[in-house]
Curated annotation (Swiss-Prot):
Catalyzes the oxidation of erythronate-4-phosphate to 3-hydroxy-2-oxo-4-phosphonooxybutanoate. InterPro entries: D-iso_2-hydroxyacid_DH_PdxB (IPR050418), D-isomer_2_OHA_DH_cat_dom (IPR006139), D-isomer_DH_CS (IPR029753), D-isomer_DH_NAD-bd (IPR006140), Erythronate-4-P_DHase (IPR020921), Erythronate-4-P_DHase_dimer (IPR024531), NAD(P)-bd_dom_sf (IPR036291), PdxB_dimer_sf (IPR038251). Its main location: cytoplasm. It comes from the Bacteria. It is an enzyme of class 1 (oxidoreductase). The active site is at residues 209, 238, 255. This is Erythronate-4-phosphate dehydrogenase. Its EC number is 1.1.1.290. SUPFAM superfamilies: Formate/glycerate dehydrogenase catalytic domain-like, NAD(P)-binding Rossmann-fold domains. Belongs to the D-isomer specific 2-hydroxyacid dehydrogenase family. PdxB subfamily. It comes from Shewanella sp. (strain W3-18-1). It is found in: Cytoplasm.
Length: 376
């Protein structure tokens, strides 16, 4: 069995090596000829899977995407051809939630404006939005949720309108899929009018899709409103972001919010489980066996951390400033965006870091944030 796999997908060999011949490929430049004789195709969001790509393949047994979203896959076409498909919903939700939370802590430190006491509006209450809310609520932050689709579906959580979030939230964090048509279209959800209407000193964090914000309008508005603070992990026109927008962001990264080692391992592992199910064979590999031990064994706390100390703990796991600095130095280079994504060092999640502190009740919130070993 020939398994064609994106070269940037981790842990493929230990998971799929027993199932067939693994052929790594560049997902962004994948051709019809390369796919022609594949039995299994494993992709990421950079690969458009459609009739054009699969036109010469008549033996494909499974398409898997190690991603939350599916907008890069023509699901109707796969359905017509009876080709099984699976993605990995929620695989990197924890990573995105922690990234957004860390970014807010970094902004708080940089501008001497504590995160504690602010109101955060989360637009999109799916896997990543929920993970972001979990971090914030663990830290005691008031969260407003906006998700008209989930609200209509009867989700029991309390929701507010986007206009309410714009009026009341100090921070807005975006976590919606890209939808280009319909009642709940998200393309340019934040257009020039809404960007202009943001309350003074709003922090805007985008970890979902670049097209959710009108990037040209964002440049115009930001140039007139220096009070707005931007954290941008996604961009219109990826992998070529607007060169004039990057310098206007307080933190800028190349679509890597979900790039934790745990998240990427989960994505590949979920596809492994699905393929084993389709082939009717036992999935006998373990996710835990894939992950290396963290380079810091444990951190002993003398007191419950304040916000400054919490940021330091977060930086032990992931220092956003490093990726921000690297991206600014590389994004104008040819293939700089993709090169940084490909060579990303796969940060760890909070769960990789064990904390030791005697007074459990004072630090339960650290356990809720995701740190391990607290109070043990």
């Amino acid at each position: 069995m020939k398994i064609l796999v994106d070269e940037n997908m981790p842990f493929v060999e230990p998971l799929f090596g027993d199932l067939g011949e693994i052929i790594p490929v560049n997902g962004r430049t994948l051709t019809v000829a390369q796919v022609r004789d594949a039995d299994v195709l494993l992709v990421r969001s950079v690969t458009k899977v459609n009739a054009e790509l699969l036109s010469d393949n008549h033996q494909l047994k499974f398409v898997g995407s190690a991603t939350i979203g599916t907008d890069h896959v023509d699901l109707a076409y796969l359905g017509e051809r009876n080709i099984p498909f699976s993605n990995a919903p929620g695989c990197n939700a924890t990573a995105v939630g922690e990234f957004a939370f860390i970014a807010m802590l970094e902004l708080a430190q940089r501008f001497d404006s504590p995160l504690k006491g602010k109101v955060v509006g989360i637009v999109g209450a799916g896997n990543t939005g929920t993970a972001t809310a979990k971090c914030l609520q663990a830290y005691g932050i008031k969260v407003l949720l906006n998700d008209p689709i989930k609200e209509k579906q009867g989700d029991p959580r309390s929701f507010v309108s986007l206009e309410t979030i714009m009026a009341q939230a100090d921070i807005i964090s975006l976590h919606v899929p890209i939808t280009r048509t319909g009642e709940h279209k998200t393309k340019h959800l934040l257009d020039e009018a809404r960007l202009t209407a943001l309350k003074p000193n709003t922090w805007l964090v985008n970890c979902c899709r670049g097209d959710v914000i009108d990037n040209k309008a964002l440049v115009r508005v930001k140039r007139q409103r220096d009070d707005l603070r931007l954290v941008l992990d996604v961009w219109e026109g990826e992998p070529t972001p607007m060169p004039e927008l990057v310098p206007l962001a307080e933190f800028a990264t190349p679509h890597i919010a979900g790039y934790s080692l745990e998240g990427k391992a989960r994505g590949t592992f979920m596809l492994y489980q699905k393929l084993c199910q389709l082939l009717n064979i036992a999935a006998d590999k373990s996710l835990l066996d894939l992950l290396p031990s963290f380079n810091i064994k444990a951190v002993e706390l003398a007191t419950a951390p304040d916000e400054k100390a919490l940021l330091q703990l977060a930086r032990f796991v992931y220092d956003l400033r490093d990726d921000d600095n690297m991206f600014r130095n590389i994004f104008l280079n040819e293939n700089g965006f993709d090169t940084m994504r490909k060579n990303h060092r796969h940060r760890r999640e909070f769960s990789a870091l064990a904390l030791a502190y005697d007074r459990q009740l004072e630090v339960d919130w650290l356990s809720n944030l995701g740190f391990s070993g607290v109070g043990q």
